[in-house]
Swiss-Prot record:
Contains an N-terminal proline-rich region (PRR), which probably plays an important role in the regulation of function of RcsF and activation of the Rcs signaling system. Residues 1-15 form the signal peptide. Interacts with DsbC. A lipid is attached at residue 16 (N-palmitoyl cysteine). The keyword Ion transport does not apply. Residues 32-50 are annotated as: PRR. The gene is rcsF. This is Outer membrane lipoprotein RcsF. It is a lipid-anchor.
Amino acid sequence: MRALPICLVALMLSGCSMLSRSPVEPVQSTAPQPKAEPAKPKAPRATPVRIYTNAEELVGKPFRDLGEVSGDSCQASNQDSPPSIPTARKRMQINASKMKANAVLLHSCEVTSGTPGCYRQAVCIGSALNITAK
């Protein structure tokens, strides 16, 4: 009597192993596939804006005045780092580049206090120029 259940279990196991199974195929995702966007071309690098400190350096060079340009560096409170004139000059160059200028004639750079929102502020002012090659 004990042999009967053992024989039945052995028969069932061998019967199941004889079944042929097809390999499982991966389930297709219902989420939309991200579309491959074409690579965006990198923005052209802006040409460097040269700073002239003396108007005599421009004698003999044809140029067009594009208007006044400025840059600033702000110290919000007395615990912040002090305002930097080199940072103000760099920001002036960036603003001139946005005006399609390739040079700036620097008029003045100074550190002031009492500007709303700033404990102290460095400001540089100049003229944005487009110098053409001869």
